[in-house]
Amino acid sequence: MTRPIQASLDLQVMKQNLAIVRRAAPEARVWSVVKANAYGHGIERVWSALGATDGFAMLNLEEAITLRERGWKGPILMLEGFFHAQDLEAYDTYRLTTCIHSNWQLKALQNARLNAPLDIYVKVNSGMNRLGFQPERAQTVWQQLRAMRNVGEMTLMSHFAQADHPEGIGEAMRRIALATEGLQCAYSLSNSAATLWHPQAHYDWVRPGIILYGASPSGQWRDIADTGLKPVMTLSSEIIGVQTLSAGERVGYGGGYSVTQEQRIGIVAAGYADGYPRHAPTGTPVLVDGIRTRTVGTVSMDMLAVDLTPCPQAGIGTPVELWGKEIKVDDVASAAGTLGYGLLCAVAPRVPFVTT
């Protein structure tokens, strides 16, 4: 038998999350973002649950090819475009839509020998300051690309830096408006946060990512608690050991947790080598036998300890939810000083996945 830890994926929930996105942006088409191996869920496991999407967006060429080989015939958007000029041969073969965010990509596309034009997304830097042409260059770049024989349909894209913050998207929208004044074009601007909270930015295509998987773009579950979105992944395990400790005894490496009175401690088959956050402190929420309790002490490579005081019936084999439907990944991440995105993407290869 394998260790009891596993990641369960509820594909029906993923379908429902996509439906919620559509209701949030009813006039827009949807790019379902499956980058980072579908945010750690496994693109081959989940893509069929998103089959009602209008297109898939990702980074990795190999994953795009996999989708084509599995039978997806709709659009595929490569969010960072091609990384080497020679990649354009595969983009041509598999009919991939490419982002163009820099001069070298523009020149490579111009010089490529393609069988048919590629649809492109011209990326404008609206304040994130990662990729994209500066707003004042946008129209020149647009006209250069429009004149190329290798270019098919064109869309203008940008990525909001603060769609989940009080500052919002006002300044970014102002920059985009200046960049595109007088330009007739389709737009794709909205990430998960803007899809939920900024309908004025929906335009033609939205690009939801983390919300499809049932986590919050702000990192706070409370911000999406009333949307109907639900977690797709449940990371669960079991108690494999129980210790009854006296006052003054300590738990884990470094003895970071000290028992103040007699206390039962459960040892769970899960640790940082499985993707559970190493820096999750004492008090991080966890569910034991359906009862909310907390971790205690330091997370080790293969195990962590939990307080069994609220669940005296718990013993060897008792189920533990590390995150999922009841213990939200955002809450675990917040306790550990990180984001739910990072935890979902970091589930280790040694953890078996099951789909329902």
Swiss-Prot record:
Its cofactor is pyridoxal 5'-phosphate. PROSITE patterns: ALANINE_RACEMASE. One of its GO terms (biological process) is D-alanine biosynthetic process. InterPro entries: Ala_racemase, Ala_racemase/Decarboxylase_C, Ala_racemase_C, Ala_racemase_N, Ala_racemase_pyridoxalP-BS, PLP-binding_barrel. It comes from the Bacteria. It catalyses: L-alanine = D-alanine. The modification N6-(pyridoxal phosphate)lysine is found at K35. Pfam families: Ala_racemase_C, Ala_racemase_N. Coiled coil: none annotated. Substrate binds at R130, M301. Its EC number is 5.1.1.1. One of its GO terms (molecular function) is alanine racemase activity. The active site is at K35 (proton acceptor), Y253 (proton acceptor). GO terms for cellular component: cytosol. Keywords: Isomerase, Pyridoxal phosphate. Isomerizes L-alanine to D-alanine which is then oxidized to pyruvate by DadA. Belongs to the alanine racemase family. This is Alanine racemase, catabolic. The gene is dadX.
